[in-house]
């Protein structure tokens, strides 16, 4: 994880079993070490904020493991003067596009006292961008409530249901649409080649088809999708089609420009061979 540069990490601490107001000195993340008996701890670092007890982190991890086929892992953590964040990754919900992996999980956040003190929300990480998606589930910080841990785990379960919905949405609409558009674009390019009247072999045909944009140019489009508010509306399919047409239109326009250059190279090569044969 990361620790903000303005934080002075001069004190280590074993975290307690209950919620307490943070002490007026800096507490940093302590990882397990072969030469130490310290455990992982997550704590906010101001007298105005709350820390996240390590027992609660373990309880959350254990609870999430009961609903996941593969062990849940702590993908990342961040400690600042404003907030403490822990990101739980679900390996069975990660999606791969060629060599790129989309990480899916839940972000647990603790902040200042108030309505935003504790929040759980699904996140998606793709192309070095971590973005919160879907609904956020919040719990107000109330020290008098003895069942806080149970309530916090309960909203984690609700957030997990939201995460499953989002992943299903990705697979059924976004990735399906991407595959359809890639196939459609290759059909367009193949038709253009035939209309030019070039009788080229499979090798040259494949070289031309290799100019087609594959999934990799769609990072910008994917980021738009997962950030779009329309993702959670009934008009999502229409919105995604319009955005895809715009992105694909630009992509295929440049591809056909490249194809035109490729065609010109073939013409010059044929002319050169014809000239050499005449000699």
Task: Locate predicted features.
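Long, contiguous regulatory modules within eukaryotic nuclear regulatory proteins
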Residues: 41-96
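Feature for intrinsically disordered/low-complexity regulatory segments and propeptides
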Residues: 1-59
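Intrinsically disordered, low-complexity regions enriched in serine/threonine
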Residues: 1-12, 76-80, 91-279
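Polar low-complexity intrinsically disordered regions
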Residues: 33-40, 60, 66, 264-279
């Amino acid at each position: 994880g990361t620790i903000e540069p303005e934080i002075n990490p001069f004190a280590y601490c074993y975290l307690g079993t209950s919620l307490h107001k943070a002490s007026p000195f800096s507490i940093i993340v302590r990882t397990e070490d072969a030469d130490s008996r310290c455990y992982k701890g997550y704590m906010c670092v101001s007298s105005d904020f709350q820390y996240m007890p390590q027992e609660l982190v373990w309880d959350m991890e254990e609870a999430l493991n009961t609903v996941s086929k593969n062990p849940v892992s702590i993908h990342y953590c961040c400690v600042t003067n404003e907030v403490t964040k822990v990101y739980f990754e679900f390996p069975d919900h990660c999606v791969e596009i060629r060599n790129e992996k989309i990480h899916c999980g839940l972000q647990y956040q603790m902040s200042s006292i108030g309505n935003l003190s504790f929040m759980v929300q699904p996140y998606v990480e793709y192309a070095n961008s971590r973005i919160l998606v879907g609904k956020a589930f919040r719990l107000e910080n109330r020290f008098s409530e003895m069942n806080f841990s149970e309530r916090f785990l309960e909203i984690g379960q609700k957030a997990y249901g939201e995460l499953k919905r989002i992943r299903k949405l990705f697979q059924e609409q976004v990735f399906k649409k991407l595959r359809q558009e890639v196939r459609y674009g290759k059909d367009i390019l193949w038709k253009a080649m035939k209309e030019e009247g070039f009788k080229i072999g499979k090798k040259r045909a494949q070289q031309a088809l290799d100019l087609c944009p594959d999934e990799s140019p769609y990072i910008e489009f994917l980021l738009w999708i997962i950030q779009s508010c329309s993702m959670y509306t009934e008009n999502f399919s229409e919105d995604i089609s319009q955005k895809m047409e715009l992105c694909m239109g630009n992509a295929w326009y440049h591809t056909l420009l490249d194809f035109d250059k490729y065609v010109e190279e073939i013409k010059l090569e044929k002319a050169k061979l014809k000239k050499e044969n005449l000699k």
